């Protein structure tokens, strides 16, 4: 009985090793095809060894389908990857790229917010969520996002100038003036900051 158990364990181990080797080989071929711009071939290499419960395969298929401009399919695979590893933000950023192309702005917003629940100081999410809110004229919430970045990185021009404009549209001209001048310090003769200051005068 013990011998049967040992043999069974070895068989399972051997099968697992063979499966790992096939997946590794498929990834290697997939990378080669991607570098040559053969995205369809790159996708087919991975589909040949597809496992629904494999995060890496799903995330990589999401990326390759994005490169192939198959954005809806890309989102579907990224969604599978996210379900497998909900705290991995890389798949969420990948999905955002595809959602941007689909102009699914509400879903983009949802993903940025989901990332910030995992990592509340993720500056990429803070910035682009801020831009999205700013473009919707939600200046109060946009300013909150930009302010968090400026507190962390006071010399980050992009966040300083966006916070300056958000403050201006909030009617906080005193704060806006300080921020526009800071933007000029970081980017001499900056046209956006100069235009902002001209509106305050």
Each model region followed by its residue ranges:
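Helix-start (N-cap) detector for alpha-helical repeat units in TPR-like alpha-solenoids
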Residues: 23, 54-57, 89-90, 123-124, ...
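Alpha-helical segment of the N-proximal tetratricopeptide repeat
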Residues: 22-51, 56, 60-67, 97
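Short coil turns that delineate tetratricopeptide repeat
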Residues: 52-54, 86, 120, 154, ...
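Structural signature of tandem alpha-helical TPR/SEL1-like repeats
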Residues: 35-44, 68-80, 101-114, 135-148, ...
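Terminal, low-structured helical/coil segments at or just beyond the last alpha-helical repeat
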Residues: 169-201
